[in-house]
Amino acid sequence: GRFIPEIVEVLKDRRPEGTVPYRLPDHCPVCGAPVVRDEDGAHIRCTGAECPAQRLRHLVHFASRDAMDIEGLGPAVVESLVGAGMVQGPGDLYHLDGEEVAKLERMGKKSAENLLAAIEKSKSNDLSRLLFAFGIRQVGQKAAKVLAARFGSLDALMAAGEEELTAVPDIGGITAQSLISWFQSPQQPAPDRDAAGGGGQPGEP
């Protein structure tokens, strides 16, 4: 079975002399934008829409196995693509030039061809995978599946209001507001229709 750790005592007498109390950062160490604490109080996150670290993390998540499952698009390749100015957001992945990708360090023609083939294959993914891949706060795999089953297409979901969203089983007000804010945010690029190639396939409920 699993063991759940519990802190029962703080042994202050074992602390080294001169220990300074830890303070949570109030600004992102990468982009300098303010950070905020999540509703559960367990996490802090950067609010910078243009934060390079967030951009990399979002792209890696988008390509991950449980999301769009783009084989060969790991952190190192994502970093190379972003560093070369080829990719700023997920939609850019679907407009890559194979010859330019092949010029990247440790890439080559064959690897570039394989990568572009994997990206093309991801267009056939169902809507639930795409929704999870967007990395919208409060929208995990389960929520993505029920939303895809209910609305059936990305356009229908984007047009839904809070009342319609909260009528979906397991979708509460916080998740509904997170979805609406994400789709309406001027800082959030519109979902690329090439990436939404599987948008007509709701996926399993």
Please place each PLM-identified region on the residue numbering.
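Accessory alpha-helical DNA-binding modules that contact the DNA backbone or grooves
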Residues: 2-205
